[in-house]
Design a protein with these regions (language model features):
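Nucleotide-activated chemistry modules centered on ATP-dependent adenylation/adenylyltransferase
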Residues: 2-406
């Protein structure tokens, strides 16, 4: 009889390490450990993952690199939309989960797996993101979640691994981190107390730069084309370059409070230097290059795009429609943005764009008009005031009351 073939979405953390060993030893399954990398793992970490997977009893280990797919199919649209959840959080690691899950589902189908296992608990968002993706993309394949379904404690998992000869250090730290291409989330410690913020030592990237520094980010049709004059065909590398320049200033640190998919409130700290800088630069450039109504409608659909990403609705067909609108909106978002960086903050300096709508033959704001006469201006103002004049003529009592209040 053939052994049951199970793919474990393997991060190298405690829950997925326990899952690999338990399924191999206790269940006798044929375990395939698959690490879906969306840009958060270093080469050294991936090597450690492979070594540990085999020590835990996996038959095979594979790294599925979906960093480019993550950028091409979602991250670029998040930049187009200047997506910040609740106006604060760049949907860092959570936006990567869907692409990790899709990669795992494809791999499971490719090897003919009977089941997919992941290490999510029953208290967070990731269980929804993984399970929903597997149900849609790998129908008929069983989903196994030992940590959730067996209500396992961290100590139980550590003890089990130690008893079976796996001695990695899973000591509970004060903080837990999820590191990704689009930022790092921080949980635990002071975050559990709504009255407190995070101390300096909680951040992985410490402040090592003083003074100020100018950075130039060049966009072409909404995508990063160059950083400080250096051209980038690889957009992921451009993001990493900006991160290396801005993170030592402590830029992009904040606290996000929001609603989880399962309905409870959640609080998370984060550090996201490159995302916050890129979004600010991109949004600044759009103010010069988009029409008023392009900006307005793009803001509306961008909020929906970010919410759907967070809520595990990336596969919803309307997302492709929103992406089409976002991409269309970027056809004139080309130019160079200059910003000044300093410890804990940054500011926009200026824009140089061939599509600059501020510098036109019609005039400059607050200066001399060139595209109309003074009589044109007076006529425009009179016509614009018509709805208000009509209303208060019909409702004189409200007009009189308004005069008294003002």
């Amino acid at each position: 009889m053939e052994k049951k073939k199970v793919v474990v979405a393997f991060s190298g953390g405690l829950d997925t390490s326990f899952t690999v060993m338990y399924l191999a030893k206790e269940k006798g399954y044929e375990v395939y450990a698959a690490c879906a990398n969306t840009g958060g793992f270093s080469t050294e970490q991936l090597k450690d993952n492979e070594k540990h997977a085999y020590e835990l009893g996996a038959k095979e280990y594979v790294t599925l690199d979906v960093t480019k797919e993550y950028y091409d199919k979602s991250l670029r649209y998040m930049i187009f939309g200047n997506v910040l959840r609740n106006g604060t959080y760049p949907i860092s690691v959570s936006s990567e989960r869907i692409f990790q899950a899709m990669a795992i589902a494809r791999y499971a189908k490719a090897i003919g797996a009977d089941a997919i296992a992941h290490g999510s608990t029953g208290a967070g968002n990731d269980q929804v993101r993984f399970d929903m993706t597997f149900l849609v993309m790998a129908p008929g394949i069983e989903i196994i979640t030992l940590t959730r379904d067996m209500a396992l404690t961290r100590q139980f998992e550590v003890d089990y691994l130690n008893e079976h000869g796996f001695k990695a250090d899973f000591k509970k730290l004060k903080y837990s981190y999820n590191v990704g291409l689009w930022g790092t989330s921080i949980c635990g410690g002071e975050i559990l107390d709504s009255t407190q913020g995070l101390p300096e030592e909680a951040y992985l990237k410490q402040i090592t730069k003083n003074g100020s520094e100018v950075i130039e980010i060049e966009f072409e049709k909404g995508e990063i084309a160059a950083v400080n004059g250096k051209k980038f065909a690889d957009k992921v590398a451009a993001i990493q370059e900006i991160e290396s320049i801005a993170a030592p200033y402590g830029i992009g640190r904040d606290m996000h409070v929001g609603d989880t998919i399962i309905g409870i409130k959640g609080r998370v700290g984060f550090e996201a230097a490159a995302p916050m800088l890129i979004i600010a630069a991109h949004k600044f450039l759009e103010k010069f290059t988009l029409s008023k109504w392009q900006q307005y409608w793009k803001d509306q659909v961008s909020n929906w795009y970010g919410m759907f990403l967070h809520e595990s609705q990336y596969l919803e067909p309307v997302m492709r429609d929103i992406e089409a609108m976002l991409e269309s909106s970027q056809r004139n978002v080309t130019g160079k943005v200059t910003m000044e960086l300093r410890p804990w903050s940054f500011s926009t300096v200026g824009v140089d764009s061939p599509c600059d709508l501020v510098k036109t033959k019609f005039g400059e704001y607050g200066e001399m008009q060139k595209g109309w006469t003074s009589e044109d201006a007076k006529g425009f103002i009179k016509v614009t005031s018509t709805p208000l004049r009509v209303y208060y003529t019909a409702h004189k009592d409200e007009g009189e009351q308004l005069e008294k209040e003002l």
